[in-house]
Amino acid sequence: GALPWYHSFGLTLTLIASALHQSKLICILDPRAGKPPFSDILKAIQDYKVTLLHAVPAMYVALAYHPNVAKYDLSSLKACGAGAAALAPATAKVFEGETGATLFEGYGLTETSPLASADPSNKRQRKFGSVGFPMPDTIIKIVDVDTGKKEMKTGDDGEVAIHGPQVMKGYWNKPKETAAVMQTIGGKRYFLSGDIGHFDKEGYLVITDRKKDMINVSGLKAWPAEIEELLTEHPKIQMAAVIGIPREDDPGNETVKAYVVLAPGQTATEEEIMTWAKDKMAAYKRPKAVEFRDALPQSAVGKVLRRILRDEELAKMGEKWEPSG
């Protein structure tokens, strides 16, 4: 286990799950340890012949593109689980190619203990870019973002609403905050997740982004996660983060800026990335600025912290960030 146990993902799917299945748990206190970073976890997988690994997407990026990954015997790995943030299909494919393991993705929140949906266990039924199907006894609806009551059509984005035995009763001693995220639909109590997504024609759940992270480009909605996923398809890009920056000449509207971490040994220019993006995404989604970084700010569980990037940009402008949506 390489996830902190104070986070619901690490607590349930690493600590509790290993106890329930009576399996040996190899505890990695710091997955970044080693020279170069993340070498110790690769060595632990090899030495202890680890068969199951749960991690966040940022960790899979680090392992998949590790400069010495080919030197380790990772053949014991059979299955790996990803969650807590969006997993780029390009990362999953590189990781599976390097290890031979099958990478499954799940979705949920602390408020849903944490799983709400997950990929089917049959690899052939897995679909990259989706988070599978609702868990047993769980109902997921896609509702409009304004009222949280109107169900959206298949394929249309809306807020993800979750009903099931794993949904929290509420926030401790915070009745107003609880009331704001709980909605009664068809006589059942649903949790409004704050995530935007849709069901595709085959019934797979696709998470688009967080509602609060929407970028307003002249009235059009641009979702950072979608743009980040497209950017990581570039052969030179290892990780990307996207934010909206307020336009000083057009109050209420934003422009798209991308922060990019290149794969080891790669070099690129802003113009090169922006030119490449012209053929990959609509004009309003394309980054108008690209900044190269050695690393992106991340939380303790590996989530990219877009808020820090926003704060850095807005500090230059002397403004305070407020969500568009």
State what each model feature region is.
Residues 68, 76, 100, 137, ...:
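Glycine-centered tight turns that cap/initiate beta-strands
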Residues 312-325:
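Acidic/polar alpha-helix N-cap and adjacent early helical turns
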Residues 133-137, 148-182, 222:
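Conserved ATP/PPi-binding loop(s) of AMP-dependent carboxylate-activating enzymes
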Residues 282-304, 322-324:
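AMP-binding/adenylate-forming catalytic domain of the ANL superfamily
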Residues 20-21, 42, 50-55, 64-126, ...:
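Gly/Ser/Thr-rich phosphate-binding loop
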Residues 6-51, 66:
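Conserved AMP-binding/adenylation subdomain of ANL enzymes
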Residues 46, 53, 164, 169-170, ...:
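AMP-binding/adenylate-forming catalytic core of the ANL superfamily
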Residues 4, 84, 108, 132, ...:
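Active-site glycine-centered loops adjacent to acidic/histidine catalytic or metal-binding residues
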